[in-house]
Amino acid sequence: MLRAALSTARRGPRLSRLLSAAATSAVPAPNQQPEVFCNQIFINNEWHDAVSKKTFPTVNPSTGEVICQVAEGNKEDVDKAVKAAQAAFQLGSPWRRMDASDRGRLLYRLADLIERDRTYLAALETLDNGKPYVISYLVDLDMVLKCLRYYAGWADKYHGKTIPIDGDFFSYTRHEPVGVCGQIIPWNFPLLMQAWKLGPALATGNVVVMKVAEQTPLTALYVANLIKEAGFPPGVVNIVPGFGPTAGAAIASHEDVDKVAFTGSTEVGHLIQVAAGSSNLKRVTLELGGKSPNIIMSDADMDWAVEQAHFALFFNQGQCCCAGSRTFVQEDVYDEFVERSVARAKSRVVGNPFDSRTEQGPQVDETQFKKILGYIKSGQQEGAKLLCGGGAAADRGYFIQPTVFGDVKDGMTIAKEEIFGPVMQILKFKTIEEVVGRANNSKYGLAAAVFTKDLDKANYLSQALQAGTVWINCYDVFGAQSPFGGYKMSGSGRELGEYGLQAYTEVKTVTVKVPQKNS
């Protein structure tokens, strides 16, 4: 994702230096203790306590200390939000009667307000999530703005067609909004995933009930305030903080929710699809887990491949669904690649995410912290070679040392399961045919990458790999214009681009009898 925000020369100083230079020249100094303004439930453009009056703590992962209490929504709160959304979607409502171009203007206005408050939002994201502030400001917020503005431009351009059917008839299609859209967003990119969900839904005229992740609710709730300020009618966007088994399950199984979009684990994706099918057969789009292969051919530019493979795995503390978490290296360059990758990992700066020199902050919470350490222990027990890292990186907070394993075999747990942390696994291969089979031998199929100077190899691998996105000589290059989604158990449907609009519309055919048809 960083490549979308920081276009740099193909050769040049490594990522940390680029970020430091960008930080000193472009990024305002953060307030390391931003005030929390929004910690309730947002329904009908108003703030509410939970029906149960329950709250839960959101925690600063750098320290383990509580930031504040947040209203804990559950089924009753979801019911209230759905009713508000239904009212906003009624025929003749201000939202339904609004011109498509005006919907676009509201999205542009929302983007402008987010840009106005960019420094505050970046600091709040870092406080609640733990990602480096420079990344929050330069990458996440930049992509949020681009996504919302991209979909604002689509609002009056995604439409139906006239169809020349036989006989004295006039036939045309309409692209109509689906209705009440449940959206459940993850904790690894809270603001960005909110934009990915809201952009296409609002551009096409839907109404939204969104559940934010309990680990990172604060920035998405602040954006709710900006949604009201932008002028969206009451009930168009409703945001419920809460937990998956309660608030999330209520959305997935609700009889009056017409569609659910979820980004998160494959395990939870299963539950959502079952709940959707056993309720009202609501539409489902799922962006789930991954174990993405990153293939380094022997003819690759070694400097570039090492740095990009490091970035592919360690970016965002390794908390990326599309992380290059199986690094396949051709045998004649394996030793050199491993040596250089270990050196790069050892030089990675882990620390205070508000320090502009920091490359890696803490994991999002204690649960993830312990889970990752458990995977590291599993790798050692199953015979992988621990080359660096392997433990906690600080006395407090949820920091983990950048970790690299060599001599990893396909059957090992760390080579099969999504770790979602700063743990690199390097595997050796001989031939291109071999690596295709091994790369595809996974239940996941979200992304893949190939590093080679041979265009024929690149083209062959891009066609052979079972993944929704394949990067050639790059990694994590995203644009609002390009669709993203997975094969197999990495999900269904696509987000971003024109393809991302399809899941939020129903295509209606209208056929009219006419006295006489003329060409």
Curated annotation (Swiss-Prot):
PTMs per UniProt: In response to mitochondrial stress, the precursor protein is ubiquitinated by the SIFI complex in the cytoplasm before mitochondrial import, leading to its degradation. Within the SIFI complex, UBR4 initiates ubiquitin chain that are further elongated or branched by KCMF1.
GO biological process: acetaldehyde metabolic process; aldehyde catabolic process; apoptotic mitochondrial changes; behavioral response to ethanol; cellular detoxification of aldehyde; cellular response to fatty acid; cellular response to hormone stimulus; cellular response to resveratrol
Residue positions of the active site: E287, C321
Recorded metabolic or biological pathway in which this protein acts: Alcohol metabolism; ethanol degradation; acetate from ethanol: step 2/2
Protein EC: 1.2.1.3
Family assignment from sequence similarity: Belongs to the aldehyde dehydrogenase family.
Functional summary from the UniProt entry: Required for clearance of cellular formaldehyde, a cytotoxic and carcinogenic metabolite that induces DNA damage.
Name of the molecule in the record: Aldehyde dehydrogenase, mitochondrial
Organism: Rattus norvegicus
